[in-house]
Design a protein with these regions (language model features):
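The alpha/beta-hydrolase serine catalytic core
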Residues: 32, 42, 144, 151, ...
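Catalytic nucleophile-loop/oxyanion-hole region of alpha/beta-hydrolase
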Residues: 73, 99-131
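Conserved alpha/beta-hydrolase
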Residues: 81-103
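Short beta-strand immediately N-terminal to the catalytic nucleophile in serine-hydrolase-like folds
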Residues: 136-138, 163
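N-terminal cap/lid segment of alpha/beta-hydrolase-fold proteins
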Residues: 20-55
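Gly/Ala-rich beta-loop-alpha elbow adjacent to hydrolase catalytic centers
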Residues: 138-142, 146
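The serine-hydrolase catalytic nucleophile loop
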Residues: 69-81, 96
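Short beta-strand element of the alpha/beta-hydrolase
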Residues: 56-66
Length: 186
């Protein structure tokens, strides 16, 4: 009878070890959501750290893609979001009007609308996940937006990272596209 008890104890210990290892592994899996915005829902991907200090606000980085891009950021945003989550920082990546999974017309891709979308995203993250200090990372046109967000947006940001930011609106020289309402796109 003693060998069975010993075997049962060893099995219980093994299960506890497996459970502990599983619980201690960071769970920073990205989650695709839609965030309510002023012009409709904003397709986004959030990535949260596995754990954060209790009672402390969670820092947030908003990743802003470039002209005709999407929230994947040419494949650079996902690894960046994973690294930030592993270091206790939440991220959200969004698709601006006419880009990625956005159902809005591309004519709505303006700096003012992009800033309004970032406002909606920051407000949502604060209300839903208790995020606090916020930084913006912007690539290309997203970098242009990030540089202007302190004047255009409603939320304070503590840091800006500009990744090859666009100069001007980024649309100069593209007149050959002959897009209807091209003048409406900033």
């Amino acid at each position: 009878r003693a060998p069975w008890i010993l075997l049962a104890c060893l099995a219980a210990i093994a299960l506890c070890i497996v459970a502990a290892v599983t619980l201690l592994q960071p769970n920073t899996n990205p989650k695709n959501i839609e965030i309510p915005g002023t012009r409709g829902n904003i397709p986004a991907t959030i990535q949260l750290p596995a754990k954060s200090a209790r009672g402390e606000e969670l820092p947030l980085v908003v990743l802003c893609h470039g002209f005709t891009g999407n929230r994947q950021g040419d494949g650079h945003f996902a690894p960046l979001a994973e690294d930030l989550a592993a270091n206790g920082i939440a991220t959200v990546r969004l698709d601006f009007a006419g880009c990625g999974d956005s159902t809005e017309p591309y004519a709505n891709y303006t700096l003012a609308n992009m800033a309004a979308d970032v406002d909606s995203v920051i407000g949502y993250m604060q209300a839903t996940y208790g995020t606090g200090k916020t930084a913006l990372v912007g690539h290309s046109m997203g970098g242009r937006l990030a540089s202007l967000y302190p004047q255009l947006g409603q939320y304070p940001v503590t840091a800006l990272a500009l990744w090859s930011p666009a100069n001007g609106t980024g649309l100069q020289g593209l007149e050959f596209l002959s897009i209807d309402n091209f003048a409406a796109v900033e």
